[in-house]
Amino acid sequence: MRNVIEIDGHEAVVAFDPQLRMLRGEFLGLSGGADFYAEDVEGLFREGRLSLKVFLNMCAEKGIDPGN
């Protein structure tokens, strides 16, 4: 089973990191890594939006295709 959520039109796979005792999300289909961590689902969406925004802004500044 794959745990996938959608944040602002982008899919991210979600897993539990037992060492950190946190949820970890990683966006799919992007040209670079954009991952995020949170202690709960609400925080995961909040951190995911922030991570995606930073990634997309950096791509725009550098003229890089974000891949999606």
Locations of the language-model features?
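A short, structured beta-strand/loop element
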Residues: 13-35
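Short, surface-exposed polybasic/aromatic micro-patch for ligand or macromolecular engagement
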Residues: 33-43
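Aromatic-residue detector
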Residues: 22, 36, 47-51
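Short, charged, surface-exposed hinge/linker loops at domain edges
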Residues: 1-13, 41-68
